[in-house]
């Protein structure tokens, strides 16, 4: 079964996280976002993964954001995907 990782991180971390994920062959969609939790200057990354890829993707995100020494780290959600259609 697939999972959808939704990661909301400061803009200054977004390129590094996207690059680290794509280097490991994960597909990433970036959306500019603003919200009440982290305020402005955020990006939302959407990453669809198979169950067996989940831990690797989460580790890549965590290591990349932690290495940035950013004060605002971000927030992450993992959602079960019932159906995935690629066209």
Regions found by a protein language model. Name each.
Residues 1-87:
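Positively charged, small/polar-rich N-terminal and surface patches that mediate targeting and assembly
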């Amino acid at each position: 079964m697939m999972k959808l990782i939704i990661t909301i991180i400061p803009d200054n971390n977004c390129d590094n996280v996207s690059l680290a994920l794509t280097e490991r062959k994960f597909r990433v969609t970036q959306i500019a976002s603003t919200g009440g939790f982290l305020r402005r200057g955020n990006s939302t990354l959407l990453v669809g993964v198979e169950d067996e890829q989940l831990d690797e993707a989460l580790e890549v995100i965590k290591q990349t954001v932690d290495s940035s020494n950013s004060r605002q780290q971000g927030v992450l959600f993992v959602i079960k995907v019932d159906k995935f259609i690629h066209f």
